[in-house]
């Protein structure tokens, strides 16, 4: 409810969540002991999934050194790089980004291909992307165009974000 409707309900009372609201989660791909797996419907509610590799040696050195002297969270002296108001402003700016009907059809073609059992790779896909993937591609392509300094979406914007939007929504078959 929080992720989809930006509200929570306790008993008969509903509370709107403050803006900006977003959920970030981490996943350890190796250790699954004591971990509760999320069902596909909940995983689908995450807009994107970004996979990070190991840090560069110099970054890992800094992490190592800072953690040796770490006493409490405040010791890191983290500072906000953007205000909540700026996040809301940027989110609203994406609404003004133009997305042509041809790009919308391109997005629908990408998503629907994951559902075609008779396609070249159909036997390897147990469950294709839901309509939430189309919505996520639509939103993220606009955000990518904005980040690239454009007020319109091009196919490259969709290609740039497609893997992060779709990777957690495609369930592979045993084949």
Model-inferred region functions:
Residues 3-97, 142-144:
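Canonical AAA+ ATPase core
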Residues 22-26, 31, 69-73, 87, ...:
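Short amphipathic alpha-helical patches
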Residues 44, 105, 138-139:
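Short alpha-helical basic/polar micro-motif
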Residues 63-64, 107, 111, 161-166:
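Short alpha-helical scaffolding segments that buttress acidic/His motifs in well-ordered protein cores
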Residues 67-70, 110, 175:
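A short, terminal or domain-edge coil/loop segment
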Residues 75-134:
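Conserved AAA+ ATPase small/helical "lid" subdomain
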Residues 115-175:
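C-terminal engagement/docking regions of AAA+ P-loop ATPases
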């Amino acid at each position: 409810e929080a992720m989809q409707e930006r509200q929570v309900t306790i008993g008969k009372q509903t509370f709107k969540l403050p803006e900006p609201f977003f959920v970030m989660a981490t996943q350890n791909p190796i250790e699954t002991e004591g971990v509760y797996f999320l069902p596909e419907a909940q995983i689908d509610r995450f807009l994107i999934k970004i996979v990070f590799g190991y840090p560069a040696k110099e970054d890992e050195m800094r992490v190592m050194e800072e953690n040796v002297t770490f006493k409490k969270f405040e010791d890191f002296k983290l500072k906000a790089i953007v205000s909540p108001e700026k996040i809301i402003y940027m989110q609203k700016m994406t609404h003004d980004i133009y997305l042509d009907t041809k790009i919308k059809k391109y997005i629908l073609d990408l998503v629907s291909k994951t559902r075609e059992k008779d396609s070249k790779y159909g036997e390897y896909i147990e469950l294709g992307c839901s309509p939430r993937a189309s919505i996520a591609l639509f939103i993220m392509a606009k955000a990518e165009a904005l980040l690239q300094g454009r007020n319109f979406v091009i196919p490259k914007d969709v290609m740039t974000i497609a893997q992060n939007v779709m990777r957690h929504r495609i369930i592979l078959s045993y084949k």
